[in-house]
């Protein structure tokens, strides 16, 4: 373990890797990251699988074994195999943490982002296909995704809610989670091992808001560059604390073994070279959060990260930052609505590339 990753973990942050591939699984890389960099979970998304499945070689034996199946089936076989194997690698981590950590996420088809029933159906299919208690099914926090989140949790299935950008949507996600856990309880499920994370995207907010601030050009605008994303996320943590402390249903569910849905900081790689490469880790350290990060960010954290608590005591300042943005005419809801739409579109584009690459692989290995 490095001092910085250990300090980050000791401060309450679970470090997850935002990456997965067949070569990473087979090389022993995950075991090394568990042993040496405090990594206790993995997230995937269509863009990650696009990168992984573009590799010629690691997936060929399974493609040959599958034969000339349709491409949708092949993609699901390849991706669920990777996730199943990764969950096995993280099983000991899961058991030692009472299934708080050791989780590996797999996302529903992004083309279903605005289809509630189809999302719910595929979430159940993926859960059964991976067939591991430390898996998590990723469902986007679109308006249509919210009831699917509740319905999936009600079946006792662990859910990672993805593509959350706004406080308004995050509050709806928490409500969907608590309702889902209440239904799971009513359905007789053991609540102890139902896990959930709320993937709140960070750096993309700065990328979008900074462009608006640069266009404004004033000294007041310049002083706010690089501040919107962290302020937004810190206020999400304030919302997390308040909602679970004050929801009248939660105390009874927690007494039955339910665990709070964890804030999960996503999109934490720094996209602006002027900012610290640990910015979206070091500035969002607090108890019971997850930070899922690309390996480049993980290596930066391990090398020179801080890891000290950094959210407590920042709420007043964070509210002030958001108010100043509004005073400059920046409508954060417009920004986050566009980021959600763009996020869904980007994942669909990646998924289309995955399908094309896997079809090419099927054709190549089967002549």
Report each predicted region and the residues it spans:
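N- or domain-start disorder-to-order transition segments that initiate the globular core
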Residues: 1-30
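Structural preference for beta-strand elements that scaffold enzyme active sites
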Residues: 12-16, 40-43, 101-105, 134-138, ...
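Active-site beta-loop-alpha junctions enriched in small/polar residues
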Residues: 18-22, 47, 107-113, 140-144, ...
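Active-site-adjacent beta->alpha loops and helix N-cap segments on the catalytic face
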Residues: 24, 115-121, 139-153, 166-178
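Conserved, mostly hydrophobic/aromatic
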Residues: 45, 106, 137, 152, ...
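Active-site beta->alpha loop and helix N-cap motifs at the rims of alpha/beta catalytic domains
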Residues: 48-148
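Catalytic alpha/beta core domains of metabolic enzymes, predominantly
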Residues: 158-296
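Flexible, acidic glycine-rich loops studded with aromatic residues
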Residues: 258-363
């Amino acid at each position: 373990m490095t001092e910085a990753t250990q300090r980050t973990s000791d401060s309450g942050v679970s470090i997850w890797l935002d990456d997965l591939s067949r070569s990473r699984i087979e090389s022993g890389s995950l075991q090394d990251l568990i042993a040496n960099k405090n990594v206790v979970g993995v997230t995937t998304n269509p863009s990650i699988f696009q990168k992984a499945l573009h590799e010629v070689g690691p997936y060929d034996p399974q493609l040959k074994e599958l034969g000339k199946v349709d491409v949708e089936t092949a993609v699901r076989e390849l991706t669920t195999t990777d996730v199943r194997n990764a969950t096995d690698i993280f099983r000991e981590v899961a058991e030692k943490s009472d299934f708080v950590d050791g989780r590996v996420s797999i996302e529903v088809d992004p083309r279903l982002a605005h289809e509630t029933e189809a999302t719910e159906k595929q979430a159940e299919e993926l859960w059964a296909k991976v067939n591991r208690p430390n898996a998590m099914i990723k469902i986007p926090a679109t308006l249509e995704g919210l009831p699917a989140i509740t319905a999936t949790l009600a079946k006792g299935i662990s859910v990672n809610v993805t593509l959350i950008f706004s406080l308004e949507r995050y509050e709806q996600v928490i409500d969907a989670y608590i309702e889902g856990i209440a239904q799971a309880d009513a359905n007789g499920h053991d609540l102890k091992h139902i896990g959930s994370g709320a993937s709140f995207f960070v750096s993309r907010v700065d990328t979008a808001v900074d462009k608006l601030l640069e266009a404004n050009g004033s000294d007041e605008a310049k002083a706010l560059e690089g501040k919107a994303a962290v302020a937004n996320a810190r206020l999400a943590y304030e919302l997390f604390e308040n909602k679970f402390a004050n929801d009248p249903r939660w105390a009874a569910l927690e007494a039955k073994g339910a665990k709070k849905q964890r804030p999960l900081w996503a999109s934490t790689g720094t996209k602006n070279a002027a900012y610290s490469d640990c910015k979206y880790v070091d500035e969002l350290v607090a108890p019971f959060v997850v930070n899922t990060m690309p390996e480049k960010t993980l290596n930066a954290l391990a090398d020179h990260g801080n890891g000290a608590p950094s959210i407590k005591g920042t709420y007043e300042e964070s509210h002030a930052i958001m108010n100043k943005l509004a005073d400059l005419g920046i409508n954060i809801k417009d920004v986050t609505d566009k980021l959600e739409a763009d996020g869904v579109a980007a994942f669909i584009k990646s998924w289309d590339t995955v399908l094309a690459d896997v079809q090419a692989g099927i054709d190549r290995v089967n002549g």
